[in-house]
From Swiss-Prot:
A UniProt-annotated Pfam family: WD40
Naturally occurring in which organism (per UniProt): Anopheles gambiae (African malaria mosquito)
Protein name listed in UniProt: Probable cytosolic iron-sulfur protein assembly protein Ciao1
Lineage: Eukaryota, Metazoa, Ecdysozoa, Arthropoda, Hexapoda
Gene Ontology cellular component terms for the protein in this record: cytosolic [4Fe-4S] assembly targeting complex
Family: Belongs to the WD repeat CIA1 family.
Amino acid sequence: MGKLELLQTLTGHAGRVWSAAWHPGGKLFASCGEDKTIRVWNKSDTDRWVAQTVLTDGHTRTIRELAWSCCGHYLASASFDTTVAVWDKKSGEFECNATLEGHDNEVKSVTWSRSGNLLATCSRDKSVWIWEIHHAPDQEDEYECVAVLNGHTQDVKKVCWHPQEDLLASASYDNTIRMYRQDLADSEWEMLEPLESHSSTVWSISFDATGQRLASCSEDTTVKVWQQYGPDNALGIPCPDRGTIWKCVCTLSGYHSRSVYDIDWCKQTGLLATACGDDTVRIFREASDSDRNEPTFELVVTVEAHSQDANKVAWHPTVPGLLLTASDDGEIKLWQYVDAD
């Protein structure tokens, strides 16, 4: 077993906090919510996290999610006002230097590819958009929509890039997860076979450090782990057209009493954190004798982290076990996971 030690509680947002995202360098994080603002936090001289900057002029409605580019120079925000804003500090202060328009309804999620050349967004309009970024010295960056993907039949809740390659995953109200890859022959983005196992809305998804596995969480109160298999795999799982296929290899059920809204797979420790509608954050650890093709995970921490729905969990990119959580209660909390074994 382990425990989560509360390090600090941060307030400042008016209303629910939907999302928080660590800067890839780990020295900053940004948060957003119902109050239409973005707060950028850093550590003070007294080693406490404080709001360094409050960005108020990017959106006219709730900001649902934030994502830093892998280089750390850009911050993207997705809003219910149907737009995505891209912020940078080229001038020394955070400024909105691009507003991406095109979705017909609330934008729910935004994510940068590992290469930094692609941005993906998804919306209540059931579509996933892929944008290509064109950087030119001494000129404004240009964002070009290179694909509109309509594989889902309902509201798309989350988009997430593979950590090593330009493979995109999306999760939806239609109970499925979709994968997308660019066809190198004609540069068109193609939809792969859907991942179907959840019986209700898939709220969030997270790849592990290798990108060989994906975790998903759902309105059906379960967490599922999916494994990627390639041609000639040892189990003999057929892979059409010599491509890869994803299979559900583990279902964690009976642990959550309400919808599971977010999940994050720690790239350092392999721990899985979940944020749930029962106000609770849970941590799962893969068993030491786990079979990769039939993995088993142990619940190692359950903590009533907030007084209302927990919306977000985010592991620190470089400090093992440091966790951010955010909630409908308007608070952001920082925790340290300690392994008691």
